[in-house]
Amino acid sequence: NFQRDVEITWGDMRR
């Protein structure tokens, strides 16, 4: 899912 990928990527990048 796009939302799931965005949440995971953003969460790891916005650490």
Swiss-Prot record:
Listed name of the protein: 30 kDa cell wall protein
Protein location: Secreted, Cell wall
Secreted in keyword set: yes
GO cellular component terms given for this protein: extracellular region
Keyword vocabulary terms for this entry: Cell wall, Secreted
Keyword Secreted tagged: yes
Species in which this protein is naturally found: Arabidopsis thaliana (Mouse-ear cress)
